Amino acid sequence: MPNTVYVDTSLLLAAFSNEPNQPIALAVLQSPQWDQVCVSDWTLAEFACALHAKVLRGETSKGVAHTIDQTIKRLLEDGALQRLPVIREDYNAVRRVTPEIRCLVRGADALHLAVADRSGMTHFASLDKTQRLAAQQWLQEVSCVPELNK
């Protein structure tokens, strides 16, 4: 079985932004243990919005945001990042599984979990504590990365 990791928006954004957790996020993305590093169409949509918000708040420039966007596109084209579609079944899974989760998971975060579950990921990468807790409940056979002490 291939060693696959689904990367959510929190980890992807930290890897490409000047954030305190950037070294952790980069270590996850660049780890040689992965056969595939996967993001969903939803991850990419959230990433674009979050990057734009950083521009509007003055945390980064339009030029830097454009460079980051081009880097993501290149990683997708080169196959370093695999793109997973979001399908109707994922939305149905969110409605079906969310009531069984024992933490307050946002719909947007539950969609990441549904895509990772349907796609058979072996690992789930997030820097969001609540998202990781929800992942441990939904994706019981999946390991969360990175190991966080928080």
Which role fits each region the language model picked out?
Residues 42, 69, 73-101:
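Acidic catalytic patch
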